[in-house]
């Protein structure tokens, strides 16, 4: 499995979310709403999730092994860094489409 495309838009929020990405796998399958989060130990990728009735968040889609998770995280964060400084980019308000 290869990540064959990454579409990323930065967001302007008060929280730790820095961007939202969509990835294409093997030119055949798209996963939307992957979040780039600025965590305590640096940037990381969070998979799409949904809040359960008891208030917990559960991933809707996720890789089942660390190798695949690494491929996805590397592809998304490489695109995030490729886009460069945030000053040169337009931001979208979180939740805007």
Swiss-Prot record:
Disulfide bonds: none annotated. It comes from the Bacteria. One of its GO terms (biological process) is sporulation resulting in formation of a cellular spore. InterPro entries: SpoVG, SpoVG_sf. The keyword Glycoprotein does not apply. Keywords: Cell cycle, Cell division, Septation, Sporulation. Essential for sporulation. Interferes with or is a negative regulator of the pathway leading to asymmetric septation. Belongs to the SpoVG family. This is Putative septation protein SpoVG. The lineage of its organism: Bacteria, Bacillati, Bacillota, Bacilli, Bacillales.
